[in-house]
């Protein structure tokens, strides 16, 4: 089936892409063109000297006389082509054999004679490895070149960015105002000075911040105040406990005592507000009570406090046991001497009574007294007698009277102002008395059958009638009489009192010195102050620490109240025993208290050291523990001692002073009032709100804490003096034999001990308050820690600011340098020496084009090499014969040596080689102008190889700019136009038909040849006509002159020269224009400048003159080495057209 196709489609089929030719389609196309233009019958006349028409060396030579054979040109063409094809087939077969490694059996079979198949196999392997190495090197070179292109692209972008920045800076610099710069410099100086001052302030602030103590070393006034005076601490204040009270009597003598001498009742006036100290010989009930309180304290506060309490109680018991043993020994030794002294004391009783009648009567004031079990007993209780008539019973001998020592602190009288002296329910042992109501009650008698004893239900109030000062002479006569009668039976004078002159009555006592006492809460209405009394005169329960007492046994055995006391049996032995017991108890108490005072001082020092060594987070707990235990190592609610409890300076007595004492003495009354300054300070400290008030309160409390060691030392000394004074008074009483002096002395000693107990109680209260306040300081440490963190953050900010200031100092501009730069004017001469941007871009573009052309060549060579290798392997696998390898190997080695030498040495021709001398390359001729002998070089050696370059390929747009691609396209069009012109010029010579894969006329179609190429080291002789070409001639004067051998065809020759120089080297166009466009080196380096124009292609001088002048601002571009070196002899023989023919492969 036939079909039609256009010539355009047939061209696309014949040449589908660059480097690919379909010869059958091309043959059909050419045949169609010849038929269309009707030249199929035209003939071409050949000279017969064409290279491709020459026969092979093994041509038949006719003998002499034979007719010369007629040579058929087509047959000759077929013979040449067949030879080439046969050789290529042999090469392919040889290459196939070389690629396949022979087996061992094949090697053994072929190893005969001169054949060495093993060596040949080894050589083949080495050739393959070399080819692979070359491929790897080429790939690496390609990658390196691509990296270089990428770097150049980045450099180009950087240059553009720098240029933009320079333009911007230049624009800004043009707009800079010198006056503004001067003002800016002044501002910078001012800011620099300010920064210097700020830096100094920052350094000062840093020093201050470093001087701030650590959080654990700081205590705020408000935190210390809350820790010392918080409401929670008020609940922990010490209250008087029942531990101080006892239902038992003083320990008796180990000797036997009669029943009637069990108790001797002596009323003793006292003004102390707290009970006496507990006896050393405590019972099991008291120990149980102490342990119970320790357990309760451990449950409510801390286990450490209870443990300390128990340990102190055990130590106290051991001290009591040792002291009791010592006392028994001492009592046994001193019993005889005491008996004698008491006998003398009985004799002086009557004398004392007579003196007591004439002595002035001291007016007592209300005050506290110790009860029967060492608890405060106050005024007459309601229900016992009416408040308006508290008269002394007339019939004291009756059996239904109330015991006066149980009524209250004053004796009953007829009015509210009747003085009522205190009577202890458990009286101290003293001398015997004839007063009936002082006799002891029988055993089992119940006191106060209608009264319940209550503990903490008493409020501190002033009773009516005792709020105003009352002089002695203003008292009612009835009351005075009653009191006088009472004083006849009770010794009231003779013992010195603190603050009261000896033997002098106290006539007036202000109401401020009246101590407060307690009344039942439900009965306060009976003792309210009168309306005309100011509120300040009325005591409240907040003015003194709350006293906590244990409830005692209630006596309600009414049937026994009417029993009359049995008559007391008198006996000096029982009185002596009781006195001995009392003296021993007092001495033991003084010794025990002195021992405990020493241990308390040591414990206080240990507590201070423990508080100093404890960590900050446990400071509050440790301080509270130590403060609650007290300086004596135990709790104050059962020890009861202190400077503020009424302890005063000691009053030493010697024997001379004691002898001068009168036998009659005033009532042992030493009123104790709580310190109003201390109470008011505690109240104001608890109610403080402002920081200044808290600071003052804390300072006041800390001042008392600082005085504790000195007060303990003073207490120790005072107890020593008291013990000495007690011994002196006891000796005096024993010598004098006065029962009144002995009772007064014991009463004074008891009063001082009670005062010491109260002082101790107040100190313990302060210590507990301070301990609880220290416990709350822990919460303030957190606030302080947060404040320190904020300070640390500010310090970091200050450090950053300092670093910025230092950086500004380093990078700040210098005004002098700026002024010099601003005042400096642009120098045109220096600007002329700088590079021009247009020139720089031009040079960069030329370099880019040169590099891309090199890359294009390398790519083309690589593809051609791969294709040639592929075809060779394919053809050798199918056509090569093993027996022809030896001759082919030699031919290949020769070709390889030549090609490698040309590639490495740049196709240089060495006239001194052995081949040059053998072929006599130089001929002796004479110069046409001066007849001087000249050596003329013969024609160059021609080399014909397979073409591997093909047409130029356009690189992708990603690797090259658009301008370069456009120039490359223009260059290819010009080259194509040159080829067309050259083909038309040669067209008149005629050519033969070329069918199939036969040879072609390379003179007319050399731009289409892609298989074979001929190399001319000194240029293509067909492109240069030496008769009409312009040559350089060396004259006699040594100057080179330009000229032609003939003036004909000058213009056409020039055109041919211009067309031939398209792909020449930039600096040597007269050497590169000799290379054929279709040869291996045809696509040479492109010109660096697109504006380059060449007017002469034969000399270096003409090429230099026609090159575009470079701008003066650019340095000369370094020239690449010439591909073909210039001949050392610049003279060429004109007119010689004789050339050597190129050898065939």
Curated annotation (Swiss-Prot):
Coiled coil, from the record: 74-101, 186-212, 744-816
Protein keywords: Coiled coil
Leader sequence segment: none
Disulfide bonds: none
Low complexity composition bias: residue spans: 1100-1111
Biased composition (Basic and acidic residues): 504-569
Region (Disordered): 489-577, 1100-1145
Highest taxon of source: Eukaryota
Amino acid composition bias (Pro residues), ranges on this chain: 1112-1124
Entry protein name: Uncharacterized protein C16orf96 homolog
């Amino acid at each position: 089936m036939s079909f039609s196709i256009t010539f355009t489609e047939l061209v696309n089929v014949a040449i589908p892409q660059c480097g690919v030719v379909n010869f059958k389609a091309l043959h059909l196309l050419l045949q169609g063109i010849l038929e269309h233009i009707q030249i199929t019958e035209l003939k071409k006349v050949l000279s017969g000297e064409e290279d491709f028409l020459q026969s092979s060396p093994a041509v038949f030579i006719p003998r002499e006389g034979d007719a010369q054979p007629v040579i058929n040109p087509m047959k000759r063409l077929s013979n040449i082509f067949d030879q080439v094809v046969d050789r290529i087939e042999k090469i392919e077969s040889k290459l196939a054999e070389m690629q396949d490694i022979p087996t061992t059996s094949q090697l053994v079979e072929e190893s005969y004679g001169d054949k060495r198949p093993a060596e040949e196999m080894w050589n083949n392997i080495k050739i393959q490895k070399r080819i692979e190495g070359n491929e790897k090197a080429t790939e690496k070179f390609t990658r390196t070149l691509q990296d270089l292109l990428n770097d150049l692209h980045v450099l180009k972008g950087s240059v553009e960015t720098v240029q933009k920045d320079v333009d911007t800076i230049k624009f800004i610099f043009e707009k800079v105002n010198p006056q503004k710069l001067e003002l800016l410099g002044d501002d910078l100086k001012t800011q620099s000075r300010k920064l210097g001052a700020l830096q100094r302030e920052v350094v000062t602030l840093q020093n201050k911040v470093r001087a701030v103590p650590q959080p654990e070393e700081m205590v705020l006034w408000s935190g210390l105040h809350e820790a010392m005076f918080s409401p929670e601490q008020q609940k922990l204040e010490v209250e008087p406990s029942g531990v101080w009270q006892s239902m038992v009597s003083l320990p008796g003598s180990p000797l036997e005592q009669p029943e009637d001498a069990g108790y001797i009742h002596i009323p003793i006036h006292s003004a102390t507000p707290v009970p006496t100290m507990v006896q050393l010989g405590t019972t099991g009930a008291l120990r149980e009570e102490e342990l119970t309180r320790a357990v309760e304290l451990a449950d409510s506060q801390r286990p450490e406090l209870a443990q300390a309490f128990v340990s102190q109680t055990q130590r106290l018991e051991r001290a009591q046991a040792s002291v009791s043993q010592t006392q028994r020994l001492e009592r046994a030794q001193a019993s005889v001497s005491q008996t004698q002294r008491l006998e003398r004391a009985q004799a002086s009783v009557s004398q004392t009574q007579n003196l007591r009648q004439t002595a002035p009567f001291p007016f007592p004031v209300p005050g506290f007294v110790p009860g029967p079990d060492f608890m405060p007993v106050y005024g007459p209780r309601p229900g016992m007698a009416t408040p308006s008539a508290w008269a002394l019973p007339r019939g004291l001998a009756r059996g239904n009277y109330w015991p006066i020592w149980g009524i209250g602190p004053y004796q009953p009288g007829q009015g509210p102002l009747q003085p009522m002296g205190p009577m202890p329910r458990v009286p101290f042992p003293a001398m015997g008395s004839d007063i009936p109501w002082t006799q002891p009650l029988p055993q089992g008698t119940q006191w106060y059958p209608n009264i319940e004893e209550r503990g903490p239900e008493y409020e501190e109030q002033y009773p009516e009638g005792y709020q105003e000062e009352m002089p002695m002479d203003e008292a009612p006569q009835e009351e005075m009489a009653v009191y006088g009668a009472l004083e006849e039976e009770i010794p009231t004078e003779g013992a010195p009192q603190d603050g009261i002159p000896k033997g002098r009555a106290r006539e007036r006592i202000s109401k401020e010195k009246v101590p407060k006492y307690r009344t039942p809460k439900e009965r306060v209405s009976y003792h309210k102050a009168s309306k005309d009394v100011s509120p300040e005169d009325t005591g409240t329960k907040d003015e003194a620490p709350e006293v906590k007492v244990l409830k005692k046994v209630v006596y309600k055995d009414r049937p026994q109240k009417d029993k009359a006391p049995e008559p007391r049996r008198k006996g000096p032995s029982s009185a002596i025993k009781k006195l001995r017991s009392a003296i021993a108890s007092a001495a033991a108490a003084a010794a025990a208290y002195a021992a405990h005072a020493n241990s308390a001082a040591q414990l206080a020092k240990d507590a201070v050291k423990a508080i100093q060594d404890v960590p900050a987070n446990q400071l509050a707990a440790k301080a509270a523990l130590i403060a609650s235990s007290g300086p004596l190592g135990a709790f104050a609610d059962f020890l009861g001692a202190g400077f503020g409890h009424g302890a005063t300076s000691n009053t030493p007595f010697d024997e001379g002073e004691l002898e001068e004492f009168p036998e009659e003495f005033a009532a042992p009354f030493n009123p104790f009032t709580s310190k109003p300054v201390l109470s008011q300070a505690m109240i104001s400290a608890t109610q403080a709100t402002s920081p200044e008030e808290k600071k003052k309160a804390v300072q006041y409390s800390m001042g008392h804490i600082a005085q504790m060691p000195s007060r303990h030392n003073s207490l120790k000394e005072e107890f020593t003096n008291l013990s000495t004074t007690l011994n002196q008074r006891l000796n005096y009483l024993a010598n004098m034999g006065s029962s009144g002096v002995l009772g007064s002395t014991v009463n004074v000693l008891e009063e001082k001990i009670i005062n010491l107990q109260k002082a101790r109680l107040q100190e313990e209260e302060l210590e507990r308050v301070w301990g609880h306040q220290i416990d709350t300081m822990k919460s303030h440490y957190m606030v302080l820690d947060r404040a320190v963190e904020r300070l640390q953050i500010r310090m970091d900010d200050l450090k950053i600011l300092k670093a910025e200031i230092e950086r500004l100092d380093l990078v700040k501009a210098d005004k002098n340098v700026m002024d010099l730069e601003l005042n400096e004017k642009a120098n045109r001469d220096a600007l002329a020496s700088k590079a021009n941007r247009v020139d720089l871009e031009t040079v960069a573009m030329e370099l880019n084009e040169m590099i891309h052309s090199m890359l294009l060549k390398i790519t083309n060579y690589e593809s051609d090499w791969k294709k040639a290798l592929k075809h060779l392997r394919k053809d050798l696998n199918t056509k090569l014969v093993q027996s022809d390898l030896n001759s082919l190997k030699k031919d290949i080695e020769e070709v390889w040596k030549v090609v490698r030498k040309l590639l490495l040495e740049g196709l240089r021709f060495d006239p001194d080689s052995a081949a040059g001398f053998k072929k006599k390359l130089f001929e002796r001729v004479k110069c046409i102008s001066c007849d001087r002998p000249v050596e003329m070089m013969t024609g160059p050696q021609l080399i014909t190889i397979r073409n591997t370059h093909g047409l130029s390929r356009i690189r992708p747009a990603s690797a090259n700019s658009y301008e370069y691609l456009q120039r490359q396209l223009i260059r290819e069009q010009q080259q194509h136009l040159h080829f067309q012109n050259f083909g038309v010029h040669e067209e008149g010579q005629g050519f033969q038909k070329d069918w199939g894969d036969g040879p072609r006329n390379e003179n007319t179609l050399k731009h289409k040849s892609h298989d074979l190429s001929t190399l001319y080291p000194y240029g293509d002789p067909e492109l240069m006509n030496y008769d009409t070409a312009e040559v350089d001639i060396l004259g006699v004067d040594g100057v080179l002159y330009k000229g032609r051998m003939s003036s004909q065809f000058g213009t056409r020759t020039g055109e041919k020269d211009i067309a031939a120089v398209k792909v020449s080297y930039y600096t040597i166009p007269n050497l590169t224009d000799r290379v054929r466009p279709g040869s291996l080196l045809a696509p040479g380096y492109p010109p660096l400048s697109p504006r380059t124009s060449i007017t002469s292609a034969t000399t270096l001088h003409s090429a230099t003159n026609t090159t575009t002048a470079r701008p003066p601002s650019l340095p000369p571009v370094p020239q690449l080495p010439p591909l073909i070196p210039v001949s050392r002899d610049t003279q060429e023989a004109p007119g010689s057209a004789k050339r050597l023919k190129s050898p065939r492969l």
